[in-house]
Every structure is written in structure tokens, then in C-alpha cells.
Amino acid sequence: MERVCVIGAGPSGITALKNILDQHLEAVAYDFNSDVGGNWIYSENESHSSVFETTHIISSKTLSQYEDFTFDDFEPDIPDYPSHDQLRRYFQAYAAKFNLYPHIEFNTLVKHCVRENDKTWKVTVEKDGIEKTETFTHLVV
């Protein structure tokens, strides 16, 4: 059975996860944050790479939206250049719409990934001080 590891549940990670699941493959995404959004989750914590509190995207929502879940599907009244918080909520709504949350392990640090001789990946993660190593056939970073 093919088993896929996706590192990160930001904008790219959730679309990768959705498309992998659409192919009926087993998949899990690991993310250091407590929710979907990646760098679009604003935080003053210096250990988290995030947008500035006043950030808005520089491309229009029309050019930045997902084809299978548009901003009009989410919130039609969002301005053409959404704020970081509107984007964060959009990404979280995308994950909810496509039932991605059960496939994401949050508050989880990916410590290292090793390609084995049998062409599998050993991925070691840490959550709440406990390490575990999982084996995957594919790795998406």
C-alpha cells in the first residue's frame, strides 16, 4: 500500500494532501502549528515564521484562489486583496470542506527524513516531547 507523508499544512500542503487523498492513497500531513495556515497564521512568537500583523496579499484573490474552492465559495464579500487573517480562515475552510483535518497531525515537529535502501522514507516526528518514526513510500515537502 502506498503511504504518503506531507510536511506542512500551509496553502501548498493542504492542496497536496487533498489531491493525494483524491487518488485514494493513505496520507498524513505533519505541521508544527496548531491549525491549518502555515506562515499565514500571525504570531508574535519568534520561533514561528509568520506574516506581519498588517500583511495583505499582493496578488488579487482571483489569481490566488483554489480552482476547486473559490473565495466566492468561501466569503463573496472578501476584498480583492485579502488580509492574512482572511487568508488563514480561507485555508482553514478549504481543509474543513475537503475533510483534511483527520489526516493532519498538528503541533508536530518533523525532526528528520531518511531515504532507505528499499526506497521508502523513514520520517521521525516529535509531539509533546515524544518521538516516533513512521515509514512512507512517498514524501512531499
Where are these regions (language model features)?
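N-terminal Rossmann-like FAD-binding beta1-loop-alpha1 element of flavoenzymes
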Residues: 2-29
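Core residues of folded domains in eukaryotic genome-function proteins
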Residues: 2-3, 23-25, 32, 36-38, ...
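Structural signal for hydrophobic/aromatic residues that build the beta-strand cores
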Residues: 4-7, 30, 40, 66, ...
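Structured beta-strand/turn binding interfaces of compact recognition modules in eukaryotic regulators
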Residues: 10, 30-33, 43, 107, ...
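Surface-exposed, flexible loop/turn segments at secondary-structure boundaries
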Residues: 12, 35, 48, 112, ...
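N-terminal, helix-rich and Lys/Arg-enriched segments in bacterial and organellar proteins
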Residues: 12, 19, 40, 94-95
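Glycine-rich active-site loop/strand segments that organize a redox cofactor
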Residues: 32-93
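Feature captures the FAD/FMN-dependent oxidoreductase FAD-binding
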Residues: 77-141
